[in-house]
């Protein structure tokens, strides 16, 4: 064990939500019937299975702040007791409006959480209703103020755009209101229609429609407005003030190994990827009895890993290493640069403002796939 290199990135999946949003495909459910104490114990037992010396920890979900103050403190304290946190530089917890009280914020801050990502999604009632969110704009602002008062070093707002019925001017107002709150980071996601969601079924029925031109207009408005206000557009969906990039997500985008614990969580370690069983009660029973929660093990081929690097690293401001592009495909670089879609130097290839809205087809073109 002493010869094993410890992992530096830990993801903890907490699947509980007040209600199930119609666009979300992550493993999640309401907490009714789940033994939350046993769930926390299972997480703490699982985290001991791999050597860890985390530089980043990320609590995602679901809604991690659905845990009570007592359970959240038990989990955070348990991690501190079990892990060497001497190199920890970022500890993020996702939260939703109405789930953070001053006492819960104090628990998180006191236990070493450095960053909170608040899932606002929108600031207007009509869009929130379409998204099936269970908070009002006023409740979102109240939660934001609680987090500000707790003096977390870094706060993020999560927003979504290109939502059915959403107008471009409404999106502008959402962005401007977000800026007025002075967040350290903003994530702005184009709505995706994921399989096994209510939104996907409505898309299939023709109730919703996609429009790439509309998506681009919303995307470019976000870029222009956020950059004009000093934010660095460092990844397709992410904007940060200086010193406030998401280090955990950056590690993922750049291909670092990571351990995921909790039901439905993915891990990628030394070319192997697996998922935990996406059933919370079964996850608890297996973990506490000493059984294996691992399912869907996948050995990542060199080509698979190369494809992922194109898809992820091209999304970043730094761009894709030039040496990943086959020599016979590099003629495409000048063609795409002449079209105003990318630029490059002797080390990296990166997308322009126009190219960022076409990241997927550009990645395919550079990989040389049909």
Predicted regions and their residues:
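Short, amphipathic alpha-helical interaction segments positioned at domain boundaries
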Residues: 354-370
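Conserved N-terminal Rossmann-fold NAD(P)-binding element of oxidoreductases
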Residues: 12
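Short, flexible hinge/linker loops that cap or flank conserved catalytic cores
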Residues: 2-4, 15
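Minor-groove-contacting beta-hairpin "wing" of winged helix-turn-helix DNA-binding domains
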Residues: 348-352
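Short amphipathic alpha-helical interaction segments
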Residues: 326-338
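A short, conserved structural fragment
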Residues: 338-347
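C-terminal scaffold of the Radical SAM
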Residues: 4-7, 29-324
